[in-house]
Amino acid sequence: MDIRQVTETIAMIEEQNFDIRTITVGISLLDCIDTDINRAAEKVYQKITTKAKNLVAVGDEIAAELGIPIVNKRVSVTPISLIGAATDAKDYIPLAKALDRAAKEIGVDFIGGFSALVQKGYQKGDEILINSIPKALAETDKVCSSVNIGSTKTGINMTAVADMGRIIKETAQLSDMGAAKLVVFANAVEDNPFMAGAFHGVGEADVVINVGVSGPGVVKRALEKVRGESFDVVAETVKKTAFKITRIGQLVGQMASERLGVKFGIVDLSLAPTPAVGDSVARVLEEMGLETVGTHGTTAALALLNDQVKKGGVMACNQVGGLSGAFIPVSEDEGMIAAVQNGSLNLEKLEAMTAICSVGLDMIAIPEATPAETIAAMIADEAAIGVINQKTTAVRIIPKGKEGDMIEFGGLLGTAPVMKVNQASSAAFIARGGQIPAPIHSFKN
C-alpha cells in the first residue's frame, strides 16, 4: 500500500464519515428449544451471553487498532417463533425479555430475531409471536422484530399483511420507539447484519459474524471530483470507491472472526446513511446532477449507484450477502428529510425507488390516524415489487402525530417529517385475506 492510499483512507475516516456500521454475530438458538418457556428463555440467555460475550471488547479493540470507527455491535438470532412453538405459552414475552437481558449483559446495541417467517401461512408459533410483538417491543429496550410476509417462490400472504397493518398500529400506540424496531419483509435474507430486520437463518452455521459498512460520504466526495463527466466515468468512480469501502469491511470481518473464534459470514454491500451532514445517500444522488432527491431522474440515479456499489463490492470480497443495496431511510438521512420538507419527495416516489434499493418505505412517519388497512396496503405494494422483481423489499413505518409534524427518534434513527398518505380506502382489498400466488417466472424447477 503506497502513501497515497494511506492518506486516502485517513481522509475517508476523518473527513467523509466512513465507518463500519455494524459487526453482527448471528447465533442459532435451535438447541435452546424446550417445552417450558421459562427454561427455553434461560437457555437462550445462556447461549447468547456465552457465544457473544467478547463481541463488544473485540469490536472496540479492532476499531482502536485500525483507527476505523465500528459504530454498532449487534446480535441476531434464530426466528423466535421457531423456539416458542415447542411451548404451550400464550405469548412469547419471556423470550423477548431473555433476549433483552442478554443484550444488556454483553453490551450490544440491538438484538434482532423476534421474528416469524409466514410467507406461505401460519404455523403454531407464528401467530402467537406476531400478536406478542407490540408488548414485546414496549417492554424491552434492545429487541428488534421482523416478519417475512412474502417471497418470489411463494407469493404474498395477504392474511399476514392485514395482521401486520394492525400490529404496526398497536406497536406505535404502546411505545414511542416500538415501530422503529419492527420491519415487514418480502424475500427476507438470512444473513442480514442490519437492524431492525436481522435474524439468523436456519441454514446458517451455529455462530457467524456478518459486517455492514457505511460510506455515502466517501462516494459523494469521489463524485465531486468528476462533476460534469459522463455516466461512464460516474459509474467507474462509484465502483472503485465501493471496492475500497468493502475491502475494509472484509478486513474487519476477518479480524473479528479470528479473535472471536467464529465463522466469517458476509459483508453487506449496503450504503447506509446517518442523520449527520456528509453521510447522506440523498446527497450522493444529488451530486449526480439532481436539484433535489425526488425529482425526475432520482430512480435512474439510484439504479446506477446501487449497481456500481455491488460491482465494486463483489470484486473486493468473495463473501457478500445481506441486503446489499442503498438504504433510503427518511429519518436517518438529512438529505431525504430536506427533500420531504421541500415537497419534492413523497411516498409514491419512495415506492418507485423500492424497485432499486433494499428497503423502500424505511423509517417513514405517517399520520397516526392512518387506518390499519392503509398500512397493510402499503406493505402489500412494497411486497409486490419485491416478489415480482425477485429482490428484498421491506416496510418500516411509524404512525405518529399529524401530517407536517416532526417526530424525533434520536441517535442513528434521526428525525422524520410526518408524510402525507393517500386518503382513499383500501379496506375492502385488504379484507379479502388469503394468498396472492407466486409470479409465473418463479416457477423454475
From Swiss-Prot:
SUPFAM superfamilies: PFL-like glycyl radical enzymes (SSF51998)
Top-rank lineage group of the source organism: Bacteria
Assembly behavior: Homodimer.
Protein family (similarity comment): Belongs to the UPF0210 family.
Listed name of the protein: UPF0210 protein SGO_0390
Source species of the chain: Streptococcus gordonii (strain Challis / ATCC 35105 / BCRC 15272 / CH1 / DL1 / V288)
